[in-house]
Amino acid sequence: MIIPVRCFTCGKPLGHLYAVFKQRVLAGEHPGKVLDDLGLVRYCCRRTLMAHVEWIDDVLIYEKR
């Protein structure tokens, strides 16, 4: 839904890195290289960014009853 502010496992701040990660991957760079450049070496942090799916726009179209 919304990008986590911190890694669920180790607690490293990640929220500020997602926009850069997404922009560079959409530009055609390899995700692994982007994560290396951002300084994410722990696999828990890498998993958090790579596995994130933005569903917030799809969820917001439904009304709450």
Curated annotation (Swiss-Prot):
**What GO terms in the biological process aspect are recorded for it?**
DNA-templated transcription
Residues annotated to bind Zn(2+): 7, 10, 44-45
Q: What is its EC number?
A: 2.7.7.6
**MF annotations from Gene Ontology:** DNA binding; DNA-directed RNA polymerase activity; zinc ion binding
Record keywords:
Cytoplasm, DNA-directed RNA polymerase, Metal-binding, Nucleotidyltransferase, Transcription, Transferase, Zinc
Cofactor annotation: Zn(2+)
Q: Which reaction does it catalyse?
A: RNA(n) + a ribonucleoside 5'-triphosphate = RNA(n+1) + diphosphate
Q: Which cysteines are joined by disulfide bonds?
A: none
Q: Which Pfam families match?
A: RNA_pol_N
Q: What class of enzyme is it?
A: transferase
Q: How is the cofactor bound?
A: Binds 1 zinc ion.
Classify the source by domain of life: Archaea
Q: Where does the record say this protein resides?
A: Cytoplasm
| Gene Ontology cellular-component terms listed | cytoplasm; DNA-directed RNA polymerase complex
Name the family the entry cites: Belongs to the archaeal Rpo10/eukaryotic RPB10 RNA polymerase subunit family.
The record ties this protein, via HAMAP family, to:
RNApol_arch_Rpo10
Q: What does this protein do?
A: DNA-dependent RNA polymerase (RNAP) catalyzes the transcription of DNA into RNA using the four ribonucleoside triphosphates as substrates.
Subunit notes for this chain?
Part of the RNA polymerase complex.
Put simply, this protein is called DNA-directed RNA polymerase subunit Rpo10
Recorded name of the encoding gene: rpo10
